[in-house]
């Protein structure tokens, strides 16, 4: 048996293209870069093989969630481009994201429109007979 380039079935064939860990995991975020940051950051003495993959997946999910909501906010405002205001509206109107990013300030995000209930005019029209909405039937 003469196999070209292989030694008894071991090793990779020479024409095999390298596949990144992000591609293996089906992610867009860079697993290798996150692994490098985890090692350089001295968060722990050693970093497991699955930790950067898991962290990349979590970060990708959070980014996709925020972008989805910000895109909806931009579309509601009839805009094609997501600006920091749309991200602010998306994060603050979502209960879980607002809790997660509660202490985060988004630059140029503005504030949520909110008028306190005490400052709103009282609806006293129903107590007294409403003149404008009276029925036309006799």
Swiss-Prot record:
The modification Phosphoserine is found at residue 135. It comes from the Eukaryota. It is found in: Nucleus; Chromosome. A motif ([ST]-Q motif) lies at residues 135-136. GO terms for molecular function: DNA binding; protein heterodimerization activity; structural constituent of chromatin. GO terms for cellular component: nucleosome; nucleus. Expressed preferentially in meristematic tissues. Keywords: Chromosome, DNA-binding, Nucleosome core, Nucleus, Phosphoprotein. SUPFAM superfamilies: Histone-fold. Residues 1-24 are annotated as: Disordered. Phosphorylated on Ser-135 (to form gamma-H2AX) in response to DNA double strand breaks (DSBs) generated by exogenous genotoxic agents and by stalled replication forks, and may also occur during meiotic recombination events. Phosphorylation can extend up to several thousand nucleosomes from the actual site of the DSB and may mark the surrounding chromatin for recruitment of proteins required for DNA damage signaling and repair. Widespread phosphorylation may also serve to amplify the damage signal or aid repair of persistent lesions. The keyword Amino-acid biosynthesis does not apply. Gene3D superfamilies: Histone, subunit A. Variant histone H2A which replaces conventional H2A in a subset of nucleosomes. Nucleosomes wrap and compact DNA into chromatin, limiting DNA accessibility to the cellular machineries which require DNA as a template. Histones thereby play a central role in transcription regulation, DNA repair, DNA replication and chromosomal stability. DNA accessibility is regulated via a complex set of post-translational modifications of histones, also called histone code, and nucleosome remodeling. The nucleosome is a histone octamer containing two molecules each of H2A, H2B, H3 and H4 assembled in one H3-H4 heterotetramer and two H2A-H2B heterodimers. The octamer wraps approximately 147 bp of DNA. Interacts with numerous proteins required for DNA damage signaling and repair when phosphorylated on Ser-135. Belongs to the histone H2A family. The [ST]-Q motif constitutes a recognition sequence for kinases from the PI3/PI4-kinase family. This is Histone H2AX. It comes from Picea abies. The lineage of its organism: Eukaryota, Viridiplantae, Streptophyta, Embryophyta, Tracheophyta.
